[in-house]
Amino acid sequence: MQYRSKNLPIILASQSPARVELLKRIKITPAQIIPADIDETPNLRESPNHLATRLAYEKATKIASQIEDSAIIIAADTVTALGRRILPKASSAEEVRYCLNILSGRRHRVYTGLCIIKKDKDQLVTRQKIVQTVLKFKRLSEEELNFYCSLDEGIDKAGGCKISGYAEAFISFISGSYSNVMGLPLFETVNSLNSLGFISYK
């Protein structure tokens, strides 16, 4: 597999270590990591899938407007939801517990909005995807909740849990992309890059 499209550099509009690791799995190392500073507050009555799609687009377009050189910008946003109830990105152990109490024993969805922009001089070509994965957590005991909250790995994670960490042991059912739950759906990422002429298998 080779990468082409005028050797345009990849810019990842995220400081997520998980997304960097996922890109490495498909043999991509970003030339730059530029986090997009945007307001991630959901709009009134905004659905989880619309929120993830909108935020990914806003991240990608913000970086595209900031850079002068040609590049391919990859942006994503992950949202965990129970029905239409959007769970926060946990900022404390208390919020981690709040999220896990909601998810305990319940089937829920993780949405990742993906937006890839190819900026070549003043021309922008955009690819957008929204991917959902259905999960069910086991019913968590108080001891399990206490233990997980003590790990701090759910801090700054959508829905208060790091699916590639200990929280993976809570999953009793999953349907859909695992990489999507980690923060970047690889199937859709590769297909989008391929449609932009970035990937060649020759």
From Swiss-Prot:
Protein's UniProt name: Nucleoside triphosphate pyrophosphatase
SUPFAM superfamilies in alphabetical order: ITPase-like
GO annotations of cellular component type: cytoplasm
Function (record text): Nucleoside triphosphate pyrophosphatase. May have a dual role in cell division arrest and in preventing the incorporation of modified nucleotides into cellular nucleic acids.
Keyword Hydrolase: yes
GO biological process: nucleotide metabolic process
Cellular compartments annotated: Cytoplasm
EC top class named in words: hydrolase
EC number annotated for this UniProt entry: 3.6.1.9
Catalysis performed (reactions): a ribonucleoside 5'-triphosphate + H2O = a ribonucleoside 5'-phosphate + diphosphate + H(+); a 2'-deoxyribonucleoside 5'-triphosphate + H2O = a 2'-deoxyribonucleoside 5'-phosphate + diphosphate + H(+)
Cofactor: a divalent metal cation
Similarity remark: Belongs to the Maf family.
CDD domains: Maf
Active site (catalytic residues): 77 (proton acceptor)
NCBIfam families found in the cross-reference section: maf (TIGR00172)
Record carries keyword Heme: no
GO molecular function, one term: nucleoside triphosphate diphosphatase activity
Keywords, ordered alphabetically: Cytoplasm, Hydrolase, Nucleotide metabolism
Any Pfam family the entry gives: Maf
Coiled-coil intervals, chain numbering: none
